[in-house]
Every structure is written in structure tokens, then in C-alpha cells.
């Protein structure tokens, strides 16, 4: 039944996104950028990034993920048109250690959030 399918689509990993808003950001980081390990605010229900690597930057420029003791456990490769998504929580540590950016590190970030933006998700 289509309403059941729609209802399932609005839930990701036990997160009800039906009353959320979509927030889209175009990001362009340059040399010197870094982002200390952090967990997202609780108002950010889901985060996703799509990498836009048009300048053949190093694959090492992807997002770093950490364990609870802030040991780096994975770097998502910074490949063109490649990305990830995750739901926020108390152990979703991520950031980016200071790395060499030759020209620029571009990304498109799409978040589902609880606060109002221009794009309401219809339930």
C-alpha cells in the first residue's frame, strides 16, 4: 500500500522525519580548514554529505569518524559524487583533522532538522 511505503520512507533508523525540515548547504573549504571532533546537535536528525571533488584533491580530505575516546576509526574517502549519511546521537563523533587542501574541498550537505527552514518535509 502506498501510504505504508511513504510512512516507511519518512523513517530512517528509527528517526521519524515526517515533521522535519530540509537544510541544504554548499560548502567550500580552503587551506587551513579543520573541524574538531563533535556530535551534532539534537535538532539535527540526520546529516548527509556528497563530495564534489572537481580539482583532484586527495581522497584523504573526507570526513573523519571517531570512537568515544576520540580515536580516529575511519575517514570517508573524498571522491567525486561520493558521500554518506548518519543519524545524530551521543556517539556519532565526526570532524576533519587539519589536512592539506591544494585548491578547495567542496561538499553539498543535506540535513533533516527540527527547526524551520524553507523546505518542510510533508507527512
Identify the function of each model-found stretch:
Residues 15-25:
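A short coil-to-beta-strand element that immediately follows conserved catalytic motifs
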Residues 23, 28-35:
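Beta-rich nucleic-acid/ligand-interaction surfaces
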Residues 1-12:
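Single conserved hydrophobic/aromatic residue that forms the stacking wall/gate
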Residues 32, 39-45, 52-123:
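Catalytic core of Fe(II)/2-oxoglutarate
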Residues 7, 25, 47, 107:
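Amphipathic alpha-helical recognition patches that constitute DNA-binding helices
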Residues 16-18, 37-41:
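Short, conserved, surface-exposed binding loops centered on an aromatic residue
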Amino acid at each position: 500500500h502506498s501510504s505504508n511505503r511513504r510512512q516507511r520512507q519518512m523513517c530512517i533508523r528509527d528517526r521519524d522525519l515526517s515533521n522535519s525540515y530540509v537544510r541544504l548547504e554548499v560548502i567550500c573549504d580552503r587551506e587551513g580548514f579543520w573541524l574538531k571532533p563533535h556530535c551534532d546537535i539534537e535538532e539535527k536528525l540526520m546529516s548527509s554529505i556528497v563530495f564534489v571533488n572537481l580539482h583532484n584533491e586527495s581522497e584523504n580530505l573526507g570526513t573523519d569518524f571517531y570512537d568515544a575516546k576520540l580515536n580516529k576509526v575511519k575517514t570517508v574517502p573524498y571522491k567525486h559524487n561520493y558521500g554518506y549519511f548518519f543519524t545524530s546521537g551521543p556517539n556519532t563523533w565526526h570532524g576533519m583533522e587539519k589536512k592539506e587542501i591544494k585548491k578547495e574541498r567542496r561538499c553539498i550537505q543535506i540535513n533533516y532538522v527540527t527547526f524551520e527552514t524553507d523546505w518542510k518535509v510533508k507527512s
